[in-house]
């Protein structure tokens, strides 16, 4: 006989208030966990937190459930159902069918403990479809599903799940921080109401998860709008300007602290080009997870940003990029100017969409004529790239006496996205994301000699319609007129009689006689 009272299940963290703990029947809850051992411990504590008469089933992915899940003799249900499944995408799709072959899911709590990074290679569309299916199934069968997902790179997935509030009743993550854990609750819906953006410190002692005592009386975090979290390099050696300033030695430590903030100002430092992509990922994570009240700035300490890099940081969620040539006084004024602002621009959930804006052309150097035309045409037709800012097309005709193949040997582009081809006695270059006013500087970096000494004629196109029109003309060139680089010549290297003494090579002297024996006897 089915229960008359609707069951309410609880997450396995002691002293957590009901608004953030209860899971009534008829919904799906999702927990991201950094470590697999924490996922197992949380699942066992959740089992022990249920009533004695509760119906509980645990599904383990890619492991034996009998070895990792256990009943507590002093608390929890009298018995639980154990299931195992393969770490495969198809197993997730057939999960509901397989469960219903064994039990009646009505009023059950199902705990699915995934394998490490199990969802990493599953596309976002299929994840959304699966969540929608599980949501409908749990409501139809009046049961609850708790997904505990361990993985060391869950930020991308967490950002995606933030928008799945129609399919998920709760979304939280448990982050390992050494001596304790940070419980980050994005949203949690139950019979007590809706809670969102909660961050609490929890600890594990003897397999029991508890709320840190200092957190118990504080439900909502205090306002941190006046806080300024900054990389120490931003102030150029100056001490913190007030009690609201907090300095960090590097961007990684700053990022971890910013994940606990709500409306603070975060100022990153950019000192080299290699930091751009990691910094963009950090900014994207903060903006997607911490919301629009946080102010995020990037201080360029050395000249390392191209226009497209700055556009990437702003698209990932930065409020402002402070240029490298701005003095400290100007930098502080710009930090002050963003106070009270709300970030209003849309930030895509998948950062790969934004990263494709910086390097959509993953080619460099010489390309065949048709490959070159197709690559540039794809750039022109990319809707994610800014209009009239995709790059510069340059056609160069060598001076008399220099073949175009010889001029090609002097063309040495260093950036990914800078490509060239030859045909019709012309050397044609496409410099991606190069501004027209920076063209001469770019050419001076590409050619070791002044271009005026190598080429007699230069034509430039920098607007999208101009480049597209020139591509139409380039495609009309017959394949017989397409050029190819000069073949590489390998000169034979003579064998040197030498030995290495541990520091450098030394030639071994060979004795030589100026006169043979016959000449010596005659003398």
UniProtKB/Swiss-Prot annotation:
GO molecular function annotation: cyclic-di-GMP binding
Pfam family of the protein (one): CBP_BcsE
Annotated signal sequence range: none
Disruption phenotype: When the bcsEFG operon is disrupted in a cellulose-synthesizing strain (a strain K12 / W3110 derivative called AR3110 with a restored, functional bcsQ gene), cellulose is no longer made.
Record annotation: effect of changing residue 139 to D: Wild-type c-di-GMP binding, complements a bcsE deletion in S.typhimurium 14028
Extra information: Cellulose production is abolished in E.coli K12 / MG1655 and W3110 due to a premature stop codon in bcsQ.
Domain description: The central domain (GIL, residues 153-492) is sufficient for c-di-GMP binding.
Protein's name according to its UniProt entry: Cyclic di-GMP binding protein BcsE
Higher taxonomy: Bacteria, Pseudomonadati, Pseudomonadota, Gammaproteobacteria, Enterobacterales
UniProt gene name: bcsE
């Amino acid at each position: 006989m089915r229960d008359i009272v609707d069951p309410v299940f609880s997450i396995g963290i002691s002293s957590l208030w009901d608004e953030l703990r209860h899971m009534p029947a008829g919904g799906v809850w999702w927990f991201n966990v950094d470590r697999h051992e924490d996922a197992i411990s949380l699942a066992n504590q959740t089992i022990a937190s249920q009533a004695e008469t509760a119906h509980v089933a645990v599904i383990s992915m890619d492991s034996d459930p009998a070895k990792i899940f256990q009943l507590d003799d002093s608390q929890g249900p009298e018995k639980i159902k154990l299931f195992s499944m393969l770490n495969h995408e198809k197993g997730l799709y057939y999960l509901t069918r397989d469960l219903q072959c064994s039990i009646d899911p009505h009023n059950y709590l199902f705990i699915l403990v995934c394998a490490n990074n199990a969802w990493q290679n599953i596309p976002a569309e299929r994840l959304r479809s699966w969540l929608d299916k599980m949501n409908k199934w749990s409501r139809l069968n009046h049961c609850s599903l708790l997904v505990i997902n361990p993985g060391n790179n869950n930020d991308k997935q967490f950002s995606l799940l933030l928008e799945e509030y129609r399919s998920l009743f709760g979304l939280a993550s448990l982050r390992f921080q050494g001596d304790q854990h940070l419980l980050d609750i994005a949203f949690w819906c139950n019979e007590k109401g809706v809670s969102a953006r909660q961050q609490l410190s929890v600890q594990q002692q003897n397999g029991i998860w508890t709320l840190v005592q200092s957190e118990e009386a504080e439900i909502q975090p205090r306002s941190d709008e006046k806080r300024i979290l900054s990389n120490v390099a931003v102030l150029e050696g100056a001490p913190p300007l007030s009690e609201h300033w907090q300095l960090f030695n590097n961007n990684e430590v700053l990022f971890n602290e910013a994940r606990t903030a709500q409306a603070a100002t975060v100022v990153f430092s950019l000192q080299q080009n290699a930091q751009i992509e990691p910094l963009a990922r950090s900014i994207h994570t903060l903006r997607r997870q911490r919301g629009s009240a946080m102010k995020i700035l990037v201080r360029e300490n050395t000249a390392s940003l191209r226009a497209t890099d700055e556009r990437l940081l702003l698209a990932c969620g930065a409020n402002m990029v402070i240029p490298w040539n701005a003095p400290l006084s100007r930098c502080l004024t710009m930090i002050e100017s963003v106070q009270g602002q709300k970030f209003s621009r849309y930030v895509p959930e998948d950062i790969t969409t934004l990263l494709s804006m910086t390097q959509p052309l993953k080619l460099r150097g010489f390309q065949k004529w048709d490959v070159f035309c197709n690559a540039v045409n794809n750039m022109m037709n990319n809707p994610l790239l800014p209009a009239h800012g995709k790059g510069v097309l340059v056609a160069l005709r060598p001076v008399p006496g220099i073949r175009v193949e010889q001029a090609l040997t002097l063309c040495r582009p260093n950036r990914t996205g800078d490509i060239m081809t030859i045909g019709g006695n012309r050397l044609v270059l496409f410099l991606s994301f190069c501004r027209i006013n920076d063209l001469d500087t770019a050419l001076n970096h590409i050619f070791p000699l002044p271009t005026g000494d190598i080429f007699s004629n230069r034509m430039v196109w920098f607007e999208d319609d101009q480049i597209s029109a020139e591509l139409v003309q380039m495609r009309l060139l017959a394949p017989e007129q397409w050029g190819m680089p000069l073949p590489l010549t390998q000169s034979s290297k003579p064998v040197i009689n030498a030995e290495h003494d541990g520091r450098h090579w030394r030639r071994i002297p060979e004795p030589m006689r100026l006169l043979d024996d016959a000449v010596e006897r005659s003398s």
